[in-house]
Amino acid sequence: MKKLFIETLGCAMNVRDSEHMIAELNQKEPYELTQNVEEADLIIINTCSVREKPVAKLFSEIGVFNKYKKPGAKIGVAGCTASHLGKDIIKRAPSVDFVIGARNVSKITEVVDKKHAVEIDTDYDESTYAFGEYRTNPFKAMVNISIGCDKSCTFCIVPATRGDEISIPSDLLVQEITKAVATGAKEVMLLGQNVNNYGRRFGATEEKIDFTGLLQKISKIEGLERIRFTSPHPLHMDDAFIQEFASNPKICKQIHVPLQSGSTSLLKVMKRGYTKENFLGRCEKIRMLCPEATISTDIIVGFPGETEADFEDTMDVLEKVRFEQLFSFKYSPRPHTEAAEFEEQIDNKIAGERLTRLQTRHTEILDEIMDAQLGKVHEVYFDELKSNGRVSGRSDDGKLVFVEGSEELLGKIVDVRIIKTSRGALDGVLV
C-alpha cells in the first residue's frame, strides 16, 4: 500500500480540505497515512497565504522534503498559496510535481499523476460535489457550508485564492452531518469564510435559507449533540442570529467575532462594513442574551495609517469585551490586495511594540478569566486520548479540559469539576 504524508498549514478550512483530499485519493487507490516523510510515496503541503510567513515556510518545507523523500516520491502543493502563485511554485521549486488550488481539491486524483499539473481555477464550483468520507477525529466532524468569500477587505487575499462565495445546499449538508453522526460524531463544526452570510448565493439550486435557518435545520438531526461554527462576520450578526445562538441548546456557547481593528476610521479603510460602536453593540447583545458565552476575535496591528489613537481604540474594545481568546498579528502586506499599495505603511518596530502591548494586556485578562474557572463544573465532550493516561475534550464554551482517564471516556459528554487552571487549559475531575 502506498503511503501519504500531508502537512496542513493555516485555518480549519484547510484542515477540512486536507481531509477531502485524503478521502478522494483513497477512493482511487488505498493510501496509508504516515508522519514520516522519508517513507511517503506522496507528499502534499496544504498551504496558507493569509500572511507572508506561511508562504515563506512553504518553500523551506519543499526543500526539506525534497532532500529526504525517497526515490520516486511525488511532492504536491495545495491550498491558498497554490491558488495565488500557481505555476510560479514549480518555477521556483522544480521538485514540485503538481499544484492544486483551494477551490479545486476535488480534482486531486486528476492531477496527482500529471507531471507539473496546475489546477487553480477560483471560479470552479465544488458546492455540490460529493466528497468521499474521511475524518481526522472520529468523534467530531468538520463540514464546509460554503466556499469562497464575497467580501473585499483591503488586507485580505482570500477572495483571490478561494473565489466568490457559493453556499452548499442545506440538504447536502444534512446528509453529510447525518452520515458523520452515524459513524460516531456527536459534534459538528460548520466552516465558512463568513458562515452567517450563508444562503446569499447557491450554485445549482434556488434554495431560500439563511444561516439561522440552517442552524435550526441541522439542530433537528437525531444524535447530533453539539454545533460549533467559524467564522461569522460582525456585519451579518442580526438579532435573529444572536437569539438563535443564545437559545438553541445544541449550539455551543463559543463564538468568534473578528474585530480586526477597534478604530472606526481604519475599519472603513479596511472595508469591514461596521463601526466600533456596531461591533461593541453586537458583543453586548451576545453577553446580554448569553452571559455564559465565550467570545474570541482576530486583531491586526500596524495596518497602514494606524495612529496611536487608532490603536488605543482597539485596546478599548479589548477592555470592554474581554475576549477569552485572541488571534493577533502584525499587518502583513499581501499580493492582490488594496492595502499592499497604501502609502502609509507602519514601521515594523512600532507595529511590534503595539502587538506586544495588546498581547500582554490580553494575557492579563485571560489569566483572570481562567482563574475564575476554579471549582466550576463544565460539561466536557472528550475526543482525544493522550499518551500520559489523560483524556482531553472541550467544554460547551470551548475551553480545553484534561482529566485522568481512559478511552472509555471518548465520545462521551461528562460533567467535570475544575481543580487546576492555566492560561491554555483546565484540569478537572469527573463529577
UniProtKB/Swiss-Prot annotation:
SUPFAM superfamilies: Radical SAM enzymes (SSF102114)
Needed co-factor(s): [4Fe-4S] cluster
One Gene Ontology cellular component: cytosol
Entry keyword set: 4Fe-4S, Cytoplasm, Iron, Iron-sulfur, Metal-binding, S-adenosyl-L-methionine, Transferase, tRNA processing
Subcellular location, record wording: Cytoplasm
Enzyme Commission number(s) from the entry: 2.8.4.3
All residue ranges annotated as the MTTase N-terminal domain in the record: 2-117
InterPro entries: Elp3/MiaA/NifB-like_rSAM, Methylthiotransferase, Methylthiotransferase_CS, Methylthiotransferase_N, Methylthiotransferase_N_sf, MiaB_methiolase, rSAM, rSAM_horseshoe
Gene3D superfamilies: Methylthiotransferase, N-terminal domain, tm_1862 like domain
Domain of life, per lineage: Bacteria
Matching CDD domains: Radical_SAM (cd01335)
The protein, known as: tRNA-2-methylthio-N(6)-dimethylallyladenosine synthase
Organism: Sulfurovum sp. (strain NBC37-1)
Organism taxonomic ancestry: Bacteria, Pseudomonadati, Campylobacterota, Epsilonproteobacteria, Campylobacterales
